[in-house]
Amino acid sequence: MNYTGFQSIADEFGFIVIYPQGTLLPATGQTHWNVGGWTTSSITDDVGFLNEVIDFLDDEYSINLKQIYSTGMSNGGYMSYKLACDLSSRIAAVVSVTGSMTVETVEGCNPSHPTSIAQIHGLEDSVVSYYGNAFSKPIEEVMDYWVDHNNCSSEPN
């Protein structure tokens, strides 16, 4: 969370930033967000947890529920996409940094509205391959999914 610089930006522009952490995945001994793929052994309901976090923030701070954004790096990027799919009624936009979408996320994705998406990814990423693998869709397919869902052009204007 320290490397994002979001706290100083939030302080300057008056918004709330939170840094939730996924739970420990026993199979790997690492923290994770349950997004399918390599996390299929997880029984954690991370979408439900983050939905409750949003409820808590609204109860405590009366947040603008139309301006909830998710960003994450690597597995956090996967989780941001999962939220855009499974909690779309509450998520305005997402940014994934070196994340992708698992096959399970794509197959279960049914967003209720067009969702702004940004993807930051290196072509030579050796952890989350830009070109996909057994767990992840290739980034171009992920972008094509959102272009189709959002009924927009992939060309900037």
Summary of predicted features, one role per range:
Residues P20, S88, P114-S116:
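Proline-centered helix-kink/hinge sites
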Residues I63-K66, S89-A92, H113:
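Structured loop/turn residues at beta-strand edges in well-structured enzyme cores
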Residues G72, G76, D125:
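Conserved G/P- and acidic residue-centered "switch" motifs that form tight phosphate/ATP-binding loops
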Residues L65-S70, S153-N157:
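Surface-exposed patches in mature extracellular/periplasmic domains of secreted proteins
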Residues A92-N157:
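The feature captures the conserved acid-bearing segment of alpha/beta-hydrolase catalytic domains
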Residues M1-Y69, Y78-D86, G108:
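Serine-hydrolase catalytic machinery in alpha/beta-hydrolase-like enzymes
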Residues S70-G72, V97:
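Short beta-strand immediately N-terminal to the catalytic nucleophile in serine-hydrolase-like folds
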